[in-house]
């Protein structure tokens, strides 16, 4: 047992010394929210490269309502970073999935609550927006100016 604890301490120490960036802690929460709100035949991954804003980066005008959900989510994260000094990609938070809605916990104005509300709003928006197959994997250089 003592060897196990020592090895664990060494591993943690080495990770810290290696200056490895933290993993997106809330990504799992956001994925779970999305899975809860979207149609059963879709996977959360199908939303990762959709339109001009769903996925990494974003530019131009959103091409439809679903893409607008991602645009709003990107801006929400941007506001959380700039106005509240939060780190949305690593911020953990508490929430509950119940009766086809999502409840975020925590005091209003805290980073945890702000980021949860960003993810909640986006996930509910995904669930209420049509997924148009031809908007998946689009040529963003051509369509997102």
Curated annotation (Swiss-Prot):
This is Basic phospholipase A2 beta-bungarotoxin A2 chain. Heterodimer; disulfide-linked. The A chains have phospholipase A2 activity and the B chains show homology with the basic protease inhibitors. The A2 chain is found in beta-3 and beta-4 bungarotoxins. GO terms for cellular component: extracellular region. Expressed by the venom gland. CDD domains: PLA2c (cd00125). Residues 18-25 form a propeptide. PANTHER family: PHOSPHOLIPASE A2 (PTHR11716:SF100), PHOSPHOLIPASE A2 FAMILY MEMBER (PTHR11716). Its cofactor is Ca(2+). Residues 1-17 form the signal peptide. Snake venom phospholipase A2 (PLA2) that inhibits neuromuscular transmission by blocking acetylcholine release from the nerve termini. PLA2 catalyzes the calcium-dependent hydrolysis of the 2-acyl groups in 3-sn-phosphoglycerides. Keywords: Calcium, Disulfide bond, Hydrolase, Lipid degradation, Lipid metabolism, Metal-binding, Neurotoxin, Presynaptic neurotoxin, Secreted, Signal, Toxin. Pfam families: Phospholip_A2_1 (PF00068). Belongs to the phospholipase A2 family. Group I subfamily. D49 sub-subfamily. Ca(2+) binds at residues 53, 55, 57, 74. Disulfide bonds join 52-144, 54-70, 69-125, 76-118, 86-111, 104-116. It comes from Bungarus multicinctus (Many-banded krait). The active site is at 73, 119.
């Amino acid at each position: 047992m003592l060897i196990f604890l020592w090895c664990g301490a060494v591993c943690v120490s080495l990770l810290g010394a290696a200056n490895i960036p933290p993993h997106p802690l809330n990504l799992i929460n956001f994925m779970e929210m999305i899975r809860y709100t979207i149609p059963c035949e879709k996977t959360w991954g199908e939303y990762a490269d959709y339109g001009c804003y769903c996925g990494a980066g974003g530019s131009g005008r959103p091409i439809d309502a679903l893409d607008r959900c991602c645009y709003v989510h990107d801006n929400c994260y941007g506001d959380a970073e700039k106005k509240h000094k939060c780190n949305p990609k690593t911020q953990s938070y508490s929430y509950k999935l119940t009766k086809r809605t999502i409840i975020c916990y925590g005091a209003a104005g805290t980073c945890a609550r702000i980021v949860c509300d960003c993810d909640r709003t986006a996930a509910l928006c995904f669930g209420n927006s049509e997924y148009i197959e031809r908007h998946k994997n689009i040529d963003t250089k051509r369509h997102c100016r």
